[in-house]
Design a protein with these regions (language model features):
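Conserved internal helical-beta-strand scaffold that buttresses enzyme catalytic cores
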Residues: 1-164
């Protein structure tokens, strides 16, 4: 299931599983999976996206965008479903399965897909002006020069109230 780790941590864990399969320490492939309840796979205004305060926590963009991105980056399967433990109607979940068979191809896929899977959700939250997400995506861009995320420009509430 899920791990509360950043992209780097998840990639290292997945690499360890893939290497264990390659070396024979594990006798069969490993499937990494996520159904919901994570940084990027769920739009749920009562749980996963409850820390998005710009009104967009009720949209399904993150789950949909995420499974499309995961599929392009090597997921073995992706899924879109509703519910996720908080009921039907206002929640959409995007999940994936990723087969780690010990191959170099699996290593390439795990790096591409897990990097996207985590940072897509962090980016989405940063665009909604979540302070922790802005911090996290800036940190990730500092580690990886290929990652370019447009950062939000915050406006003082008093300025908005004055003009609107």
């Amino acid at each position: 299931r899920i791990l509360y780790a950043d992209a780097e941590g998840r990639i290292k864990i997945a690499e360890a599983f893939n290497n264990a399969v390659a070396s024979g320490e594990l006798s069969a492939p490993v499937i990494l999976g996520r159904d919901h309840h994570d940084v990027s796979g769920t739009d749920s205004p009562y749980r996963e996206t409850s820390n998005i305060y710009d009104g967009s926590q009720f949209t399904a963009d993150m789950a949909i965008q995420n499974v499309i991105g995961d599929s392009f980056r090597g997921a073995t399967w992706v899924s879109i479903h509703n519910g996720g433990g908080v009921g039907w109607g206002e929640v959409i979940n995007g999940g994936f399965g990723l087969t780690l068979d010990g191959s170099k191809d699996a290593e390439r896929k795990l790096k591409n897909m897990l990097f996207w899977d985590v940072n897509n959700g962090i980016s989405r939250r940063s665009w909604a002006r979540n302070d922790e997400a802005i911090f996290a995506i800036k940190r990730e861009m500092g580690k990886n020069s290929a990652l370019k995320v447009t950062l939000p420009n915050k406006v003082a509430d008093s300025l908005i109230e004055k003009h609107f």
